[in-house]
């Protein structure tokens, strides 16, 4: 074990950055240019050692850590909520806030951990929704830590056990955060804290229930994809294409070849969108083709630039990127990273994403005319499938501030706006003009988490059309069975009415297939459906059940049939050694976008699993990031008088 006061040697640090011993010296293994931070000038000579920008010691650098430890990128969300009715307790809680701020900065630099923390003070009367869930009297300090793998855990840490010095507070907090991190964070403690012992304890379920009689545990679940992300292209299908006849040039795209040029463009243009790509990778090649077509078509203002970095010609400039980064588009505003998308869609998808990025997370509607227009789904002169509008008496209203936080967390995915009406109570509504039920009103608490749940769930169509493809993780790698209406003249009422019920959509995913293309015929054949047959297919992983459309008489009857099917023998069991029947629909979309190619559809047993075991990255909550800083784009938290965010 290395002494705690000894940092990594130059040789050890090079091994940790590069993973091999062929290079000795300090190597820039992060990519500062990706977030608008100016790196040093271009090196001279062949492959010289790089230099970190001032104040930056590298993502995996920590002078007190054992050499060779390179933490995995991770995201954690936390809330420090406290009630300090006297001076002694106020002093302690103030120290905790300062220590949290210091920890956040240090872990981001040294442990590649993105920590998003919110401080909530409940000592005086407040509207903050979280205070209502805890005792209205007494003294308490709670830390709620949440990550996607373990969910939320509430910890208690008392002043009397941790007030010795800031080091004891730090060790208590690091103990809690370590339980939600891939590896222990104790190694990243400050010199003041490393010899201290803090005390923090997770509350039991019984203790949680006894905190407040009004407290209720309701798990928040959100849709992963927005309405513009329902038909994304599958990278695995792009990998097996030849890429022949792809257009690989565009007069509308600016090529960037150096850090100096990159920095100049960030200063010259207010908005910059950049694709980093590599011609040696088939997925990246197809993404560049799409991006060049977007640049030729989209209408943008003079202060906005679409550009690309050909990494196959600029290896040093793109150092630190991985395979997924080579089909990622990054957005900048006023020189700062504001977001990114690694999703691959058609030209319309990228157009919508750019427009959403330019318009911001939330728009203010200045008058009744604009409000009426937005309600009809008209945003930026185009008809959108869904929009969400909040009406508030003031932009200082707590409900509005929480709505704003929710919108910023979902930035780049949804069309969200607000209207100020001094005589109105807070109200939020989602409008979907193509649905039978055109509006959905919000009736929950005005807290960011449940507002996000409402926006994501109310914006998705009740029945998702998959005839022309679908996003892989929309149907695969999740627990809900898939219901597919195939054939039938017009709308099948029991199916459509059941899909309109929120509780039913929590249990099933409702989809529909129309048409008779060759790929649709292959899908129907693989599911055991005749060419002219009208049927509902109940697909539960590899189990196929077929329900004739004529059988259900009403929504309730259909629901009973579905409940009985769960325990009955399947009509057909799909083989994991054969291509998944729905994969053919995704091939159809790829051919539509890039032109027809005879595509070999391969079996993939992971499509039958709840999650992809070969996913490169662990799931990260929206807005999270790690590793290369340009991956950390997203909505910024908003401060209010009731709570501050570090």
From Swiss-Prot:
Q: Where is this region: Disordered?
A: 40-60, 620-646
Signal peptide range: 1-29
Q: Per the record, where are the segments of Pro residues compositional bias?
A: 40-51
Q: Where is the composition biased (Gly residues)?
A: 622-636
Q: Which domain of life is it from?
A: Eukaryota
Q: Which Gene3D superfamilies match?
A: Glutaredoxin (3.40.30.10)
* Segments crossing the lipid bilayer: none
Glycoprotein found in the keyword field: no
Instruction: Please provide the record's keywords in A-Z order.
Output: Signal
Q: Report the InterPro entries cross-referenced here.
A: Thioredoxin-like_sf, TXNDC16
Protein name, as recorded: Uncharacterized protein R05D3.9
